[in-house]
Amino acid sequence: MWKGKTRGGVSGYLFFIYLIRYCGVKAAYGFLSLIVLYFIPFAPKATKSIWQYARRILKRNRIQSVGLLLNNYYRLGQILIDKVAIGNGMIDKYHFKFNHYQEFLNVLDGDQGVIMIGAHVGSWEIGTPFFNDYSKKMNVVMYDAEHQKIKEILKKNGQQQPYKIIPVNEDNLAHIFKITEALDHKEYVCFQGDRYLNADKLLTCKFMGHEAHFPIGPFLLASRMKVPVVFYFAMREAKQTYHFHFILAEQVSGSKEKRAEQLLLEQYVNALEKIIGQYPEPVSYTHLRAHETLANL
């Protein structure tokens, strides 16, 4: 189970920030290609899970699985580099495509707060420049350990966060009140719907043919608050292109057979499966969620 921390030290992130700023994006890609082998032995759990995914789910042979492993780490590194580059004003070096963008903006312009639920595929932060003034009303819910690391990186790099953070700490429920307050003020609250800290507060749903666990929080809040819900994915394509997918969730009403939060989760999983079908690589945490037991076989 994920512990709310993102791989990579602050010094490593800062190195890439300076490399991109003074040598350019292509230089960062080049350096990444030299160090991608590092991740295979030094990220053993991820390596084993990706290998099992390639062999047992995608049915790749050994040579193809090695290629997928190397390509996977390289492409994940590219996404991190892109995130830093765009955050440092290099947006003109990238191309962007959108699905249902105007419908999404219409929801944001409505008379209610909005809940946005993403996943750990692609890179949701890439979309920040397109939100413009909407960013002032965005509240990103993230675990406190990750929040502290991002704060340190931004402070050392002299940058400001374009959106607000609601840190989640297992020891108290302060984040619940902040989320409710943000929605009451017609602001937007952004979650990742595929990771959890508390194994006691989960929903179960069939995902890619396997039973998988998801955090109950985003789906319970969305169903209780009766606000619009948008599923949001920003996916990397060829030639430094990012494709934004906005899926407006249908309103749900629970019953004795199935609660409202479960119905909303099923909509989310359906959207997520379609995205993964379109973008089978790089293999992310989300791809492995339904197959997490494979690493223990």
Question: Positions of the model-derived regions?
Answer:
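Membrane-anchoring hydrophobic helices of lipid-metabolizing enzymes
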Residues: 1-118, 151-155
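Conserved binding/catalytic microenvironments
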Residues: 191
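Short acidic active-site motifs
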Residues: 174-179
